[in-house]
Structure formats: structure tokens, C-alpha cells
Amino acid sequence: AFTPDADFPLIYGEKGIVRALASKMVDLSPIVAMSGGSVSNAVCDSFVVTLPKDKKLEASLKDRKDVDLSSAGEIDILTFKGKAAHGSTPEKGVNAALLAFSFLGSFYQIPFLKKLSDLLSDPTGKSFHGDSYDETFHNATWNYGVINYESNKRVFTATIDYRFGSSADPKKAIAAFEEATSTNVNILSEDKVLLADKKGPLVSTLMKSYRRTTHRIFDKPFAIGGGTYAKEAPNCVAYGSAFKGHPGDIHSPNEYIYLEDLYKQIAIY
């Protein structure tokens, strides 16, 4: 079976994905509140922290270009600016929450924030022994997309998007995260690794049709860190229908397809 849920030529491997929520009861005084991120599968690119007005803090931020400072009465509002990236490639982004943890943890000597900054800055999870590597999927990745804290409840939460290859033990990796960060982790969902035989009849037959139609005989099937509908059925792979580099505004209001591409897809399928 195949699903037209990705790019040609064919995806034979998809990382496993664990989506989880880490939480901890903790006092992060003098911080009043922290929040950032909108979805778990994207790098948090903006993180807002509110604190009591502090002239020394304000002075220390004068030369920083990655923080915007504003005030409202007796409250300072800090907006840390990172760089967005997909949750499968957190190394391509800059997590704004981790920028905040690094700065505030050192400035106010907050042990929990200093610990998170030290442990979570490496997106492979190596700092807390949550890493793994194999030739097909390369490094595991850890992304923390939505982070919140409220001083009145003293509850810190962070979403986890953990993606791993065939060599990983996800239970051990999550346990390592819990132990290192002193948090409680609640697993929300888990997708297993998908790995089809590149030389098997399914992949070989589909690649033969693709190459015969497009004449792109050197294109090869590939593996990804994301997930497709192929995981929802046995013996299934993602096979098209998009052609790499061709515009189409996927998932946008003006999503479209060139007729030339449509006719080529019909011929392949």
C-alpha cells in the first residue's frame, strides 16, 4: 500500500515520535509568569517572561538584540526572540525559551532554569543520555515547543517532541529525561519507527513506476524525521504526490497544483 502524503520519489523510513508533557511543581521567584510557543512540533521562536520591575535587570539587557523589554506599571515584560523551525529539525532553529532559561537562570541564580539550559540546549539529547544514532535516521531529536509557568500555581510545563530511529529505546530515553530534569513526564502519544525494505517488492515496484515515468533513474527513496499517514496502515509507504522543489503552497488557503504535475502523477500512479 502507499499514501500520497509526501514527496516523490518515495519515503521508506520515518522516525518514531513520542509526544509528551513534562511538568514540575517549582518556585521560580521572582518570575511571575512565562509562556511561549504555539505547537509542540515547532521550535519556540518567541518567549514572554513577566517579572517585578528591576533596574539592574533592565540595564543588563541594553546590549542584547534577542530580547525586547517593555514595562507596564511595576512589571517588566521580556520577550526573547528565537528562530522557528520544524520539530523534526530543531537544530535549524533557536529555542527562545532556552535563551530565557540561560539568561534568567544565571541572573537570578535559579537552579531549575540553569539545569534546563544546560541539559536541553543540545537537540540530540546527549546532555541527559537521551541520544541515539543509526545510519538510516542519524541523530534522535528533542524539541520543546510550548512552555508555560505561572507563579500563583507554581507549575512549570513543557511539551516534548522526541523523534528517534531504529536503534533507540524510547522508554529509556524518556526515563533519562525525567531523571535528569527532575520532572514528571506524561506520554500523550507514540508513533513507532517505520522502516520498509528498500529492496523489497513494494518499494521496488513503486520506484520502477516513478523512474519509468519521470526518467529520473538516479533518484532514490529516502528517510525522514517527520511522519506521514503511512504509519496508519501495515506494509505502507509514502509515495508522492508532490515533486520536490515544485511550488504548491501546501496546507495554505491558496493551495494549488500545476496541471503538468497532475498529469505526471496520474501516469506514475
Give residue ranges: language-model regions.
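Midchain, well-structured core segments that form catalytic/ion-binding scaffolds
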Residues: 2-167
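A structural micro-motif
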Residues: 29, 51, 67, 183, ...
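Generic low-polarity alpha-helical segments
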Residues: 1-2, 229
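Conserved short beta-strand edge segments in small beta-sheet-based binding/regulatory domains
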Residues: 66-75, 181-191
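An extended, acidic, His-containing surface patch that forms the Zn2+-binding/catalytic region
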Residues: 88-151, 159, 163-167, 171-172, ...
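Class I S-adenosyl-L-methionine
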Residues: 58-65, 174-182, 207, 211
